[in-house]
Amino acid sequence: HDFRISDRWSPLSEKRPLRPETRYIILHTTEGATEGALAKIQRYGEAHYLVAVSGEVYRIVDQKKIATHAGRSMWEGRSPIDNYSIGIEVVGYHDQDLTEAQYAALRELLRQLKGRYRIKDQDILSHCMVAYGRPNQFHPEEHRGRKRCGMLFSRPEVRKRLGLSAGPRRDPDVEAGRLAVADQELYQHLYAQAGAATVPDKLAAAQARPEAPKPAVEAMVIAKGVNAWSIARERYAKPTT
């Protein structure tokens, strides 16, 4: 596979400030197709790179500048993560595998960025690891579980194919008591294979988010075990929701 980067600069790239330091790479899934995702990300400067299904890589925001890709986010007490990271959007879904072309392209892109910024494998993270939510009526504390974006990038077999060693063994902000856990299912997915399969009792949110029913259409209907917050997540209580 020939590694190619095409420029699709955001009109906001030139206006963005330089990033004070680069500690992390954050991997996202678009949860939609290339055309719509690229248009939105380009318009708002929401990632440095996008990797299409074909393996084409698009450069959107200057890698030395801040891209607004992580939203409300924290890792190791640092917040927002936009100020410390490079954001890569990968076209696809958090629970579906990448194409062979995407694996090849993303692996090479990560290899180059790791070398340039001396980023350790442990600091290449899924968006869902660093995102957090504000207190709301379902979860009285600031909490993990706001998103499942990029969830597949925590899987050991996926990381191996990307040339990465295992991800973090624990959530530093949960362990330090800075954040509670709202989505125990997600927490277990991210950290179970590292020996942290259970949420620390003293830090768990009062009510764990129940497992979403299948199929997906049913997951959008309020019913027993499916409340408004579990559907709307970060959009809950917004006037547009």
Language model regions located:
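Basic/polar, cationic surfaces and motifs that engage anionic cell-wall
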Residues: H1, Y93-P210
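Alpha-helix initiation/capping motif
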Residues: A33, K120, S154, K238-T240
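Active-site-adjacent loop/helix surface patches within enzyme catalytic domains
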Residues: H1-K120
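Primarily a LysM-type cell-wall glycan-binding module
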Residues: A206-P239
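A generic secondary-structure boundary signal that marks alpha-helix termini
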Residues: G115, T240-T241
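Soluble periplasmic/extracytoplasmic beta-strand elements of cell-envelope proteins
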Residues: I26, L50, G87-E89, L125, ...
